[in-house]
């Protein structure tokens, strides 16, 4: 890979302190406990990085933090492209967009409740703090593994500006710039932008002259810092991300078990690689260990409707957000209000099967809005610091999965291999999953740090959270009607396009499929599923630390937290798959 070539063009007076990796870590100021402290003064396991350190390491997205943070891993699901964050082995494996993470993500003090919202470019960063272990007292739910705080550079009193341009492999062009300065006696502003584009993809098709993986993304942020009075200020933060990049394709590697999908028409020649003349050899579209070798489906035309779908793995995602942070210094007490709103819209296609054939692909459409409000009072002196606060959040998600499957998977292969008759007679080609999820959460919290001697300090924290999450949805018959054909053949229903096809398979339900078949009313076993999870949890933290000297802090912590429960928002066949998932406590 070519080394990234960077040139820094200075516009005006540039006053940006550079912190090298060799400098001692105590020079980094963090806000892990909602107030500024030296990283060596905090009784929390923290990896803190300055913006310059991150820039030197090619920091581009939030997921890149895993490359230089011990214990942090980030994997992207092939099914939906949702990032999965794990710290010290505490994570989750759920490709549903609606699933809650075990790692909290905060951007300039505002929580991002779903990891799919974190995939935009990172730029003009002041620092990033990775907190390890449950952070339930100050940050609340969904921080059982830890917390990551992303902090942007703030507007400056003096004018400064900068522009960085870079060229890299695959024709990648990376441009980042900012301008900052005074807007009068009582206001300061900052505008920053970054765009990354590449001229070619890094994945190469194993069956045709095609490539995948081009980047085309842009992000900007405008910040306005206004002094409302001598002791009151407001920081406005408007941000926008547009991502038109291509997703990666799965790689089918040498040794992959060839499934039934390849055995039947129209892929009958593949049988030669199982029991024919080429038995035991690797099909030509399977990689032999090359990381950039892959295959994918570019389009699919429905035989039933004649409609052609663009299935090339790619994104059309936008995030728009606005936050306002108000601080009122009342002398010994500081009142802080943080209000945040984010709107995330997504149309994204992914290929699951790793081959050129269309055995498993999907298009995700997401409409997600989030709102949060935090109010907190804080104060203290050299010996005692305290925080009291309340928090409220509300988010709503509408998700639409359109799944595509081939006749080789559910049709002809079934006939060739004597699978269940309905699949051979009525293959399923497309299906839709649609759902709505609404989540409301409220919390009260307190935090006290008491230095009872020159070296010893005791920290106590507690938070009570009440959450309600409602999920309503179903797997519906798509426009091609093939799912209805299967259900009507298998169960004697009278389904049509747009009808719910999720089976009530709960034996305790009065409308379960077996009871309805006996009663001669099978249609009654199919209806939209809806349920609500209500969670009330008390979380706490106790830390005792001992300061050996300015460079060494010994501490011990006992803390707990919880990850919100949820629902299987992805494709489901029966209502038992949609039963609520209980909260996870750690």
Where are these regions (language model features)?
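Hydrophobic, lipid-facing positions within transmembrane beta-strands of outer-membrane proteins
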Residues: 26, 83, 146, 159, ...
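Periplasmic-side early beta-strands and strand-to-turn transitions of outer-membrane beta-barrels
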Residues: 149, 157-158, 166, 178-277, ...
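Acidic, small-polar-rich N-terminal luminal/periplasmic segments of exported/outer-membrane proteins
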Residues: 23-158
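Outer-membrane beta-barrel translocator/receptor signature
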Residues: 83, 100-102, 114, 123-132, ...
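Solvent-exposed loop segments that connect transmembrane elements
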Residues: 202-211, 248-308, 353-361, 402-434, ...
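Structural signature of Gram-negative outer-membrane beta-barrels, strongest in the C-terminal barrel
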Residues: 225-229, 377-378, 389-393, 437-586
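Transmembrane beta-strands of outer-membrane beta-barrel pores
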Residues: 165-169, 195-199, 240-244, 330, ...
């Amino acid at each position: 890979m070519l080394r990234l070539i960077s040139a820094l063009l200075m516009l005006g007076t540039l006053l940006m302190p550079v912190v090298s990796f060799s400098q001692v870590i105590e020079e980094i100021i963090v806000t892990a406990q909602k107030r500024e402290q030296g990283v060596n003064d905090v009784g929390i396991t923290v990896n803190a990085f300055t913006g310059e350190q991150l820039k030197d390491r090619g920091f581009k997205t939030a997921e890149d933090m895993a490359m230089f943070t011990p214990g942090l891993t980030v994997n992207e699901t092939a099914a939906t492209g949702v990032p999965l964050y794990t710290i010290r082995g505490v994570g989750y494996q759920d490709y549903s967009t609606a699933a809650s993470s075990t790692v909290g993500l905060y951007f300039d003090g505002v929580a991002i409740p779903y990891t799919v919202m974190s995939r935009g470019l990172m730029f003009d960063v002041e620092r990033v703090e990775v907190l390890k272990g449950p952070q339930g007292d100050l940050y609340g739910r969904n921080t059982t593994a830890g917390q990551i705080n992303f902090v942007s550079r703030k507007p400056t009193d003096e004018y400064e500006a900068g522009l960085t341009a870079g060229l890299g492999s695959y024709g990648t062009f990376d441009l980042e710039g900012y301008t900052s300065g005074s807007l009068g006696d009582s206001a300061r502003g900052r505008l920053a932008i970054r765009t990354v584009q590449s001229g070619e993809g890094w994945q190469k098709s194993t069956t045709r002259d095609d490539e995948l993986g081009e980047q085309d993304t842009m992000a900007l942020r405008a910040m306005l810092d206004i002094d409302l009075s001598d002791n009151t200020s407001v920081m406005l933060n408007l941000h926008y991300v547009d991502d038109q990049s291509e997703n990666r394709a799965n790689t089918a590697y040498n040794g992959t078990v060839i499934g039934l999908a390849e055995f039947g028409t129209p892929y009958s020649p593949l049988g030669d690689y199982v029991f024919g003349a080429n038995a035991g050899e690797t099909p030509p579209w399977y990689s032999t260990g090359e990381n950039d070798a892959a295959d994918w489906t570019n389009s699919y035309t429905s035989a039933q409707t004649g409609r052609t779908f663009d299935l090339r793995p790619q994104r059309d995602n936008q995030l728009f957000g606005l936050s306002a942070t108000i601080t009122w210094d009342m002398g010994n007490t500081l009142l802080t209000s943080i209000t945040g709103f984010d709107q995330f819209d997504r149309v994204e296609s992914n290929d699951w099967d790793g081959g050129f054939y269309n055995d498993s692909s999907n298009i995700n459409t997401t409409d997600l809005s989030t709102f949060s409000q935090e109010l907190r009072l804080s104060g203290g002196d050299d010996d005692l610091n305290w925080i009291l606060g309340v928090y409220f959040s509300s988010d709503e998600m509408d998700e639409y999965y359109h799944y595509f499957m081939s006749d080789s998977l559910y049709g002809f292969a079934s006939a060739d291999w004597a699978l269940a008759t309905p699949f051979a007679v009525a293959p399923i080609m497309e299906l839709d999953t649609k759902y709505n999820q609404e989540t409301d959460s409220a919390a009260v919290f307190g935090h006290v740090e008491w230095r009872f001697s020159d070296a010893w300090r005791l920290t106590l924290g507690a938070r009570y959270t009440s959450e309600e999450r409602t999920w309503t949805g179903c797997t519906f018959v798509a426009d091609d009607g093939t799912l209805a054909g299967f259900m009507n053949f298998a169960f004697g229903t009278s389904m049509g396009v747009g009808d719910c096809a999720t089976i009530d398979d709960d034996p305790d339900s009065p409308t379960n499929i077996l009871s309805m078949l006996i009663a001669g009313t099978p249609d009654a076993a199919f209806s939209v599923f809806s349920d609500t999870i209500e969670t009330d949890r008390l979380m706490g933290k106790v830390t005792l630390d001992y300061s050996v000297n300015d460079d060494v802090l010994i501490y011990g912590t006992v803390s707990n937290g919880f990850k919100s429960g949820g629902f299987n928002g992805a494709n489901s066949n029966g209502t038992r798959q949609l039963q609520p998932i209980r909260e996870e406590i750690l």
